[in-house]
Amino acid sequence: MPDISLSIPRRRLPRLRPLAAAVLGAVLLHGQAWAAQPVEKPQPVPAQAGNEPGLTQGLKETGNYTVTTAPAEPLHLDPPKLPDLSGYTAAAVEAKIVRKPGGRASVQRMVQQQPLKEFTGGSNRLAEWVKRQRQMPQAIFIEGGYVNLAQLAGKLPASALEQVEPGVFVARLPIVVSQGATLDIDKQVKELRLSQERGAFLVNDGMLFVRDSKVTGWSESKKEPAWFKTPNEFRPFLISWGGAEVYLSNSTFTSFGYNASKAYGISISQYSPGMDKQMKRPRPKGWVIDSTIVDSWYGFYCYEADDLVVKGNTYRDNIVYGIDPHDRSHRLIIADNTVHGTRKKHGIIVSREVNDSFIFNNRSYENKLSGIVLDRNSEGNLVAYNEVYRNHSDGITLYESGDNLLWGNQVLANRRHGIRVRNSVNIRLYENLAAGNQLIGVYGHIKDLTNTDRNIALDPFDTKVSLIVVGGKLAGNGSGPLSVDSPLSLELYRVAMLAPTKSSGISLPGVLGEKQDQILDLLVRQDKAVLIDPVESQAELQD
């Protein structure tokens, strides 16, 4: 077996953060005893007869796969260019506020109001508000221009909005920001409490600002936040619709959302397909920056929304997901967030054609399943420089999502795989560190999803997987550094495999194990790029 502790090419890796340095140090220390043992050095594998002189494509057939040297130059990539975040600030939010003309607030019925149809239409949802308000349901409507919530003190009935102590307001009806209106909730409002018992929530169809404040789903009977108990129990929420803009800055949102359509927590969503065709609104806009979101059903959700910014937030102890952009949302920036303690599923997930987006410099840890997930044909995304650790499943997971680049991530001490790729092609993994994960450092595989509850027409898939792995370190992962089952192709170059957990040394599971000697000889001893692919494709190459 090759001694891969020797002759590893020197190269520049991303700077290790303290946790990454500690984990890597521990696994390297664990591997020192193995590295010190004398091992039999392999003989170089000779080129196959019949190759043209000067080519580096000698075939080495093993089972149904071949190991081939590949040109390294096409594998070179410059570090990815990240979006400039300097413009997404509290001052930039302030500059977006237009304070004239002044607007007004009034109490009106909820029925026959476009922004509320999602909550008063099918599935007998109107009954929820009848039960809670004990009357034909009403809401507070902001109309006609700019309104600061603090200025409404004493101007509406206490059954609608009451200031219960200086700067602390309780809303006992839903608040609707109408098209053409602006609602500003600023530091004059120490806390806006949305009454759970009375069915209050926030709907934005105009411009909504929450700055230096606190908004809480509130149990009036218990005099505390409406802490999560069961999925279907109503809790207040915030939704911003197509054509509207929402800017949440330096604020805290607690105990939002439940298991009902568009009532998930903090949501930015185009109108439903039927209403969208009728209303023809542009896609919604918004930023969520430098804020804290706690105990929400979904910490953040979007649907058919473009160019949103989710930056510098803390998502803590949310229920299903921390950050969940969904269906056909594009060019998102998800950066500098800390996401931890998600109780049911993933920290950060983008799902169903969330394309051309940037997920970088986030920390996602101690979530119930994976730290970061790309799902259901989400393509063209960059996942870079994230620290993903101690999650209860994988670190980073890609399901049925091709053409994505993972660069410089530190994926550490997760309970399953470090980086897992399923049914996804043209996945490029550059300069990543996967260390101390309980199963495989990088795991690629295929799975037939036909006989599952998946809607194949809505979420098609191919049972194909292909990866390019360049640079980085795979160290001290419990079941091995790398495994790819049935790859369409796999390219490896400058990958350091360190600190095996088994006394026998580095072991590549699965089909890679059958040709481990050839792979490690080319990759480590000869410092060449290695291509592993099916015999059929190599036969096509020769033809």
Curated annotation (Swiss-Prot):
Catalyzes the epimerization of beta-D-mannuronate to alpha-L-guluronate during the synthesis of the linear polysaccharide alginate. In addition, is part of a periplasmic protein complex that protects alginate from degradation by AlgL by channeling the newly formed alginate polymer through a scaffold that transfers the alginate polymer through the periplasmic space to the outer membrane secretin AlgE. PbH1 repeats lie at residues 243-270, 283-304, 305-327, 329-352, 354-376, 378-400, 401-423. It comes from Pseudomonas aeruginosa (strain ATCC 15692 / DSM 22644 / CIP 104116 / JCM 14847 / LMG 12228 / 1C / PRS 101 / PAO1). One of its GO terms (cellular component) is periplasmic space. It holds the Pfam family NosD. Belongs to the D-mannuronate C5-epimerase family. Inhibited by the presence of acetyl groups on the substrate. The C-terminal region contains a right-handed beta-helix (RHbetaH) fold, which is common among proteins that bind and cleave long-chain linear polysaccharides. This is Mannuronan C5-epimerase. Pathway: Glycan biosynthesis; alginate biosynthesis. Changing residue 365 to F: Can complement the alginate secretion defect of FRD1200 mutant and the epimerase defect of FRD462 mutant. It is an enzyme of class 5 (isomerase).
